[in-house]
Every structure is written in structure tokens, then in C-alpha cells.
């Protein structure tokens, strides 16, 4: 069977296979030969896409981060109005993906790769900003308020990935989401009071 040409192969497909390989075997077991076996490509094709093994690890990790962020944040965004469901289901989603998330943490904290991975930080910041702005428009809260809550959401999730304290994580999620709910209620109350004041001024009241 003919080896697929590098130009005929979608790089996203390659990155997905490389990331799955990292999750299955760990950083120490990465080799071009094993990557060839996993992707079904020859060494020449691998080097067409990547300069070396380290670039494979970094690019595959970036792919993994992006895909997992999208999966998790899309779910959170879809169910943001249902706090009890989010607090119940989101930890399950994290637990189902814990091995992949731990690989990302390992690469991000590795002395060999952390500086290089920081080059991708603008991409991740953009993603968090994008979700914060979408959520701001959906629930009519200021972007700055939402952005802080998104950062807290991400922070407690990373803490859970490292420690795997699911009870603590659920409590922290409830706290962050309740803060979001209270901010929404406060905003609605302020808007209602403002509307009532405007109505009083426009209609007038006999003294």
C-alpha cells in the first residue's frame, strides 16, 4: 500500500494522532519511528510537517489544548443557565479527559518545553477572551466581570487536574457559578430600577 503523500494529508489529522500518541505513551517514549507507525506516514512525511521531535510535542500539545478548550468551554457556554447541571456534569467531563489534560500540564510545566509553549499563550488568551465576550453578550454583563470569572473557572479546573480533588472542585465551581448568577441578578435589578426612574421622570407624578 502506498504511503500517503505529506501534501495529501490534513495536518489536523496528523496532530490529532500525535496528541493521542503523547497521551498513550508519555513524553519519554516519543520517537519519530513510533510516530510513523501511529500516523501511517514515513519519516520523510513527518519531517515535512515538523522540524524535529520537540516540534511534534509542542504542536500536538497546542492542538490538544485548543481542542479541549473548545469542547469544555462550548459545553459550559451551552449550559451556563443551569448551575446544578454544570456542577454535576462538568467535573465528569474533566475526569473523562484527565489523562489528556495531565499531558498538557506536564508539557506546560516541563523546563524543556514551557518557554516554547508560552509562545502560544496569545492564542489561548484570545480563546478565553472570545468566550468571555460571547457570554457577556448572552447574559448582558460587562466583559471585565465575565473575564475575571472565566479566569477563576479555568484556574480551579487546572487545580483539579493537578490534585484530582473532585469534592473541592465541585464546591469551587458552585462558588464561581453562583458569583456569576449573583452578578446577573444585580445587573437586572439595577436595570429595572433605572427603568423605573426613567418612567417616573417621563410620566411625571403629582405632588
Language-model regions: role of each:
Residues 1-9, 192-207:
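N-terminal intrinsically disordered/low-complexity leader segments
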Residues 7, 19, 33-35, 50, ...:
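Recognition helices and adjacent regulatory flanks at domain boundaries
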Residues 13, 17, 21-55, 59:
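Helix-turn-helix
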Residues 59, 72-98, 149-150:
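Hydrophobic alpha-helical connector segments
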Residues 62-69:
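Short, basic, alpha-helical segments at the C-terminal edge of helix-turn-helix-like DNA-binding modules
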Residues 74, 99, 113-148, 174-178:
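Amphipathic alpha-helical packing segments from all-alpha helical-bundle domains
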Residues 88-96, 103-114, 136, 180:
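Helix-loop "lid/cap" segments that line or gate small-molecule binding pockets
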Residues 96, 106, 140, 144-171, ...:
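Amphipathic C-terminal alpha-helical segment
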Amino acid at each position: 500500500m502506498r504511503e500517503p503523500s505529506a501534501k495529501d494529508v490534513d495536518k489536523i489529522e496528523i496532530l490529532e494522532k500525535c496528541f493521542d500518541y503523547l497521551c498513550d505513551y508519555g513524553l519519554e517514549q516519543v520517537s519519530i519511528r513510533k510516530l510513523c507507525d501511529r500516523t501511517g506516514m514515513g519519516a520523510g512525511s513527518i519531517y515535512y510537517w515538523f522540524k524535529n521531535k520537540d516540534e511534534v510535542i509542542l504542536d500536538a500539545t497546542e492542538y490538544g489544548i485548543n481542542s479541549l478548550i473548545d469542547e469544555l468551554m462550548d459545553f459550559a457556554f451551552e449550559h451556563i443557565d443551569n448551575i446544578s447541571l454544570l456542577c454535576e456534569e462538568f467535573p465528569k467531563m474533566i475526569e473523562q479527559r484527565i489523562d489528556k489534560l495531565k499531558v498538557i500540564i506536564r508539557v506546560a510545566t516541563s523546563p524543556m518545553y514551557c518557554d516554547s509553549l508560552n509562545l502560544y499563550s496569545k492564542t489561548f488568551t484570545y480563546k478565553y477572551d472570545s468566550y468571555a465576550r460571547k457570554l457577556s453578550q448572552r447574559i448582558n454583563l460587562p466583559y471585565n466581570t465575565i473575564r475575571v470569572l472565566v479566569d477563576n473557572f479555568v484556574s480551579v479546573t487546572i487545580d483539579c487536574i493537578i490534585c484530582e480533588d473532585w469534592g473541592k472542585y465541585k464546591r469551587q465551581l458552585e462558588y464561581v457559578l453562583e458569583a456569576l448568577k449573583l452578578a446577573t441578578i444585580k445587573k437586572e435589578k439595577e436595570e429595572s430600577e433605572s427603568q423605573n426612574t426613567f418612567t417616573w421622570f417621563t410620566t411625571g407624578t403629582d405632588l
